[in-house]
């Protein structure tokens, strides 16, 4: 009792006398927390024993707790203390106060606290649509004219074929701008589409009720599927109808300047067919086909068209299993030189696994399942654009009840390995400086590291769906906390969400328009000690190697394959909040 009274009296003094300034050293999820979920703040380089939760005006102290620490990462000398206020469940808006240091950004505690993020991360894909104007009704102040109709695309010399020789003009409209540039890449669309189609398959009721104000809203299909169809219809046009092969990308010869889409009018090409493109195409269209069956009355015949195209591309890939995209070699042989994103993948074993799995699930034809080795080794690599093995595993787990018995042994292996991965991800979580799965190793901080955090979260959610172990879902939630501000940089990495967010992302429409605010809902790439862009960074420490500057395409660019796992992560946690007990009904 004496200790509690002392803490209370100290709280009265501390909050009023020492905490009249906001401190960047206090890191919180700037969006907020669910009432009954874990709630943690991290305090950098300031030793503290106690913390308080107060109203934003500091007038009322509502909770006092004991901080723990110090914690640090093996690659950094920075120490943190953790303030765990999970037991504080009152809804409202609050700040964390550290005596003699200051107070945090305000945050909300409420049910559905991440719904705006789930909506915005999905709506971001609408803002990246090409071949259509974005009117004020749907885009607000980010309205713009149409860019890149892609109705006059030239077949590049590298893609020349008997029925489509060099210089042939084809039409391949729609799709999304891939990243900060204005090109479209089939390989990167693969993991992007697969991740978001999986979100819809895993949480169909949630997404059927999630509307984001796009032109198709209210047409009888979920908005996530409406948005995916914009890119799917472009992907279909990337298949050569004469042989089933798929062009690797649709691109200008070089990157466009810092222009708005309608002003970027250089000639565009479809470039070389590749095995990786064909297999990504196969997987996406096979998965899309089974989802579209439910909407046959709205998009008649599209499900059949998708599975037929998927099989056609698979057959091409089987006949051409090692056609790799090597841009430098291609440029030595053909003109004009193409120097945009390569997405060259020299190992397509995982793409064969994923494509075969999706064909097997959709068609029921076991020849696809038996055509690949699902377990070439024991690895469980977190997905990325050039590593899609786990997408195959996730689909098999998702459809376990619909599969023939001969597949059950493989599914049990996947369950065991996924649970092992989940345990590795959350091991020693409480001793990490920001109480996040992300950042346990400097290897997490690659180009697009924030997508690593989001994809780690997806792995943990799949483990939760498989086992019911809430520790895995908590781990996924902690990575969302990381992305929303509880990290070494202090940034909430999603544009328009939080109080300190990237304002100068490497994204041409956001840079070239006259608005100070970037397009909302976009996930910045995140800390990258490789610093390949040569910009000035504030730190070489892996988890701090981020700069909010247009020049930093290595840490501050956006990309569809980084946003897609954010869509899944934020939407899944929203969908699961009541079943997991994070929020009351």
Language-model features: locations:
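Bacterial Sec-dependent N-terminal signal peptides
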Residues: 1-21
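Aromatic (Trp/Tyr) and acidic
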Residues: 27-103, 111-112, 127-190, 194, ...
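Acidic/aromatic-lined carbohydrate-recognition and catalytic surfaces
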Residues: 75, 103-119, 207-227
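Short coil/linker segments at helix-helix boundaries
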Residues: 198-230, 263-269, 287-306
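Carboxylate/His-rich catalytic cores and anion/metal-binding grooves
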Residues: 222-245
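Proline-centered turn/helix-capping motifs that create local helix->coil transitions or kinks
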Residues: 239-248, 321-329, 364, 430-431
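Hydrophobic, small-residue-rich alpha-helical packing segments that form membrane-like cores
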Residues: 311-315, 319-322
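Solenoid-like repeat scaffolds
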Residues: 375-382
């Amino acid at each position: 009792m004496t200790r509690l009274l002392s803490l209370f009296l100290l709280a009265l003094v501390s909050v009023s006398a020492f905490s009249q300034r906001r401190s960047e050293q206090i890191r919180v999820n700037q969006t907020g927390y669910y009432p009954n979920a874990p709630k943690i703040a991290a305090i950098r380089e300031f030793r503290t024993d106690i913390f308080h939760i107060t109203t934003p005006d500091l007038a009322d102290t509502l909770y006092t707790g004991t901080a723990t620490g110090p914690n640090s990462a093996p690659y950094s000398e920075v120490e943190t203390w953790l303030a765990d206020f999970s037991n504080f469940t009152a809804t409202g808006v609050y700040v964390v106060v550290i005596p003699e240091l200051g107070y945090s950004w305000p945050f909300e505690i409420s049910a559905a606290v991440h719904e705006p993020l789930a909506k915005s991360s999905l709506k971001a894909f609408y803002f990246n649509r090409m071949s259509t104007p974005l009117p004020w009704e749907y885009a607000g102040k980010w309205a713009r004219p149409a860019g890149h109709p892609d109705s006059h695309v030239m077949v590049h010399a590298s893609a020349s074929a008997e029925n489509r020789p060099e210089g042939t003009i084809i039409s391949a409209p729609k799709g999304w701008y891939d990243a900060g540039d204005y090109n479209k890449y089939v390989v990167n669309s693969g993991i992007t589409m697969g991740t978001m189609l999986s979100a819809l398959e895993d949480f169909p009721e949630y997404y059927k009720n999630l509307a984001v104000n796009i032109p198709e809203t209210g047409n009888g299909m979920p908005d996530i599927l409406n948005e995916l169809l914009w890119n799917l219809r472009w992907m279909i046009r990337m298949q050569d109808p004469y042989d089933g092969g798929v062009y690797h990308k649709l691109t200008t010869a070089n990157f466009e300047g810092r222009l708005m889409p309608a002003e970027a009018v250089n000639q565009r090409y479809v470039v070389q067919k590749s095995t990786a493109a064909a297999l990504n195409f196969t997987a996406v269209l096979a998965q899309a086909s089974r989802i579209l069956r439910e909407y046959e009355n709205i998009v008649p015949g599209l499900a059949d068209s998708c599975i037929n195209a998927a099989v056609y591309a698979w057959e091409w890939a089987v006949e051409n299993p090692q056609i790799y995209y090597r841009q430098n070699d291609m440029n030595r042989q053909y003109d004009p030189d193409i120097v945009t994103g390569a997405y060259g993948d020299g190992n397509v074993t995982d793409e064969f696994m994923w494509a075969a799995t999706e064909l097997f699930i959709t068609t029921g034809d076991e020849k696809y399942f038996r055509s690949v080795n699902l377990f070439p080794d024991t690895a469980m690599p977190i997905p990325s654009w050039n590593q899609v093995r786990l997408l195959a595993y996730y689909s098999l787990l998702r459809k376990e009840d619909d599969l023939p018995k001969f597949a059950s042994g493989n599914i049990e292996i996947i369950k065991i390995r996924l649970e092992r991965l989940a345990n590795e991800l959350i091991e020693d979580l409480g001793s990490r400086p920001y109480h996040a799965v992300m950042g346990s190793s400097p290897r997490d901080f690659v180009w697009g590291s924030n997508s690593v955090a989001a994809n780690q979260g997806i792995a943990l959610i799949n483990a939760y769906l498989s086992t019911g172990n809430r520790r895995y879902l908590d781990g996924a939630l902690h990575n969302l906390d990381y992305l929303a501000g509880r990290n070494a940089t202090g940034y909430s990495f999603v544009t328009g969400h939080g109080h300190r967010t990237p304002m100068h992302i490497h994204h041409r429409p956001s840079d070239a328009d006259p608005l100070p605010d970037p397009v909302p809902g976009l996930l910045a790439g995140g800390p990258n000690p490789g610093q390949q862009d040569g910009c000035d960074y504030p730190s070489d420490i892996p988890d701090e190697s981020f700069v909010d500057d247009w020049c930093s395409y290595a840490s501050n660019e956006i990309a569809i394959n980084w946003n897609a796992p954010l869509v899944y992560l934020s939407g899944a946690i929203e969908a699961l909040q009541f079943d997991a007990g994070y929020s009351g009904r």
